[in-house]
Swiss-Prot record:
Record's catalysed reaction(s): (6R)-5,10-methylene-5,6,7,8-tetrahydrofolate + NADP(+) = (6R)-5,10-methenyltetrahydrofolate + NADPH; (6R)-5,10-methenyltetrahydrofolate + H2O = (6R)-10-formyltetrahydrofolate + H(+)
Naturally occurring in which organism (per UniProt): Burkholderia thailandensis (strain ATCC 700388 / DSM 13276 / CCUG 48851 / CIP 106301 / E264)
PROSITE patterns: THF_DHG_CYH_1, THF_DHG_CYH_2
Name this polypeptide is given: Bifunctional protein FolD
Record keyword Magnesium present: no
GO BP terms: L-histidine biosynthetic process; methionine biosynthetic process; purine nucleotide biosynthetic process; tetrahydrofolate interconversion
HAMAP family per the UniProt record, alphabetical: THF_DHG_CYH
Length: 285
């Protein structure tokens, strides 16, 4: 393998230690950071994500609250619970694990979270503020990717960056953060005519579509930085990303593995956002 591995586990460990230190300082002043996580239904993947988030809180000195509801929970009941958490001074961050059951409007649920507690960064107030470069919170996955660029000293100013994927959770905010950092950004997606023509010119490629082998070695410029946000399963049932790791790692300059790349960073930045919310609340108290 010629590419330098961007180790999300190692970087997460460093950033979580910093978050734990900040959490301890707040707790000493009577403002222990608190995160509420709401899980509706029994999606197995969601259960794993929620368990990992709660464990990260416990390991780093945060107060955490897990609300578990059956898939039959009504939308008004969920909105009422969010209202209670909005008013709870012990809770600084509220996260509703997606996806939600079909009868619940996820947009309405996200908009019900107070913007100052929207640690996922999905509320329209935070999404809009991201356009101005002044959000209260940056969405956790793109924020984590930016921390990777910073830690590995990947130059962004003037770089050609391609983001594959246009979701509100990763693709769009990722493109905005890269733009803010001075990169020239292209967003590609399922309707893009010649994906390879775009990626071959890119100094940075972020793959975030949830489709195996969407990026192969022949599509990558030698020495490029490749960030794999995808979470898929291969034919053997093993976790894999959107990038053909074996091939692309022979061409790229830097690459993230799956697992052990972007995944741990997402939860780490959730802790960082919760700390920032708690620090703001403490300053206003």
């Amino acid at each position: 393998m010629t590419a330098t591995l961007i180790d999300g586990n190692a970087l997460s460990k460093t950033l979580r230690a910093q978050a734990a230190k900040r959490a301890a300082a707040l707790a000493a002043r009577g403002h222990r950071p608190g995160l509420a996580v709401i899980l509706v239904g029994d999606n197995p993947a969601s259960e794993v994500y929620v368990r990992n988030k709660i464990k990260a809180c416990e390991d780093n000195g945060f107060f955490s609250l897990k609300d578990r509801y059956p898939a039959t929970l009504s939308e008004p009941e969920l909105l009422a619970r969010i209202g209670e958490l909005n008013r709870d001074p012990k809770i600084h961050g509220i996260l509703v694990q997606l996806p939600l059951p079909a009868h619940i409007d996820s947009h309405k649920v996200i908009e019900a979270i107070a913007p100052e507690k929207d640690v996922d960064g999905f509320h329209v107030a935070n999404a809009g503020a991201l356009l101005t470069g002044k959000p209260l919170f940056r969405p956790c996955t793109p924020y984590g990717v930016m921390k990777m660029f910073e830690a590995y000293k990947i130059p962004l100013q003037g770089a050609n960056a391609v983001v594959i994927g246009r979701s509100n959770i990763v693709g769009k905010p990722m493109a905005l953060l890269l733009l803010e950092a001075g990169a020239t950004v292209t967003i590609c997606h399922s309707k893009t005519r010649d994906l390879a023509a775009h990626t071959r010119e890119a100094d940075i490629v972020v793959a975030a579509v949830g489709k195996r082998n969407v990026l192969t070695a022949d599509m990558v410029k030698p020495g490029a930085t490749v960030i794999d946000v995808g979470m898929n399963r291969n034919d053997e049932g093993k976790l894999c990303g959107d990038v053909d790791f074996a091939g692309v790692s022979q061409v790229a300059g830097h690459i993230t593995p799956v697992p052990g790349g972007v995944g741990p960073m997402t939860i780490t930045m959730l802790l960082v956002n919760t700390i920032e919310a708690a620090e703001r609340a403490a300053a206003a108290a």
